[in-house]
Amino acid sequence: MNSAKLIDHTLLKPESTRTQIDQIIDEAKAYHFKSVCVNPTHVKYAAERLADSEVLVCTVIGFPLGASTTATKAFETEDAIQNGADEIDMVINIGALKDGRFDDVQQDIEAVVKAAKGHTVKVIIETVLLDHDEIVKASELTKVAGADFVKTSTGFAGGGATAEDVKLMKDTVGADVEVKASGGVRNLEDFNKMVEAGATRIGASAGVQIMQGLEADSDY
């Protein structure tokens, strides 16, 4: 397993500067991460900087609340793809899920999948705000809507990925949909727990620390 290829090297803080974006791009190139995940305002710049690289550009849609209208999320997606995004991480309508308005949640995801035009779509369900049954339902809706991944968290809701939630999500979606763990994955131990639970992508700002942990392990 090439661990670096499981990592979306992430910087989504609202105060992120161009200098900080340059840093994560340079790190992603050096460690051969799967992608850099940045806010939409940075997509075009990141795509230009990574044009000669295998590192993909990932961005976020309806982020972090998921409370934008479906039409807005679809437009954001189209704009991001036009600017060079390779992968889309969208946030579901969490309130609609809790209301039991499952058709609305599914249609919201489907609109982004359609707007992404074949690009990878990951669906953030914000597990920290959901109970067991809601995690299962959100994962099922992600699968039915045709997305590629179900993802745990934005990192903005006071909690992140747990191995238990990742396993539940993976057990729900089966082989057809992948699971991305994000939020609170800060070191090699966290990384390994998520992978063992079934995650095939890790969103983390600590990608370098994770890789340094792997290098230290291999020294023994």
Swiss-Prot record:
Active site, UniProt feature: 89 (proton donor/acceptor), 151 (schiff-base intermediate with acetaldehyde), 180 (proton donor/acceptor)
Reaction(s) catalysed by this chain's protein: 2-deoxy-D-ribose 5-phosphate = D-glyceraldehyde 3-phosphate + acetaldehyde
InterPro entries reported for this sequence: Aldolase_TIM (IPR013785), DeoC (IPR011343), DeoC/FbaB/LacD_aldolase (IPR002915), DeoC_typeI (IPR028581)
GO cellular component, as recorded: cytoplasm
Lineage top rank: taxon: Bacteria
GO molecular function, one term: deoxyribose-phosphate aldolase activity
Listed pathway(s): Carbohydrate degradation; 2-deoxy-D-ribose 1-phosphate degradation; D-glyceraldehyde 3-phosphate and acetaldehyde from 2-deoxy-alpha-D-ribose 1-phosphate: step 2/2
Keyword entries, A-Z: Cytoplasm, Lyase, Schiff base
Any one Pfam family match given in the protein's UniProt record, by short name: DeoC
CDD domains: DeoC (cd00959)
Compartment list: Cytoplasm
GO biological process terms, semicolon-separated: 2-deoxyribose 1-phosphate catabolic process; carbohydrate catabolic process; deoxyribonucleotide catabolic process
Keyword Lyase: yes
Transmembrane intervals: none
Cleavable signal peptide: none
Documented EC number(s): 4.1.2.4
Predominant subcellular localization, coarse grouping: cytoplasm
Name of the top EC class for this enzyme: lyase
Function of the protein: Catalyzes a reversible aldol reaction between acetaldehyde and D-glyceraldehyde 3-phosphate to generate 2-deoxy-D-ribose 5-phosphate.
Alphabetized NCBIfam families for the sequence: deoC
Family: Belongs to the DeoC/FbaB aldolase family. DeoC type 1 subfamily.
Protein name as catalogued: Deoxyribose-phosphate aldolase 2
Lineage, highest ranks first: Bacteria, Bacillati, Bacillota, Bacilli, Bacillales
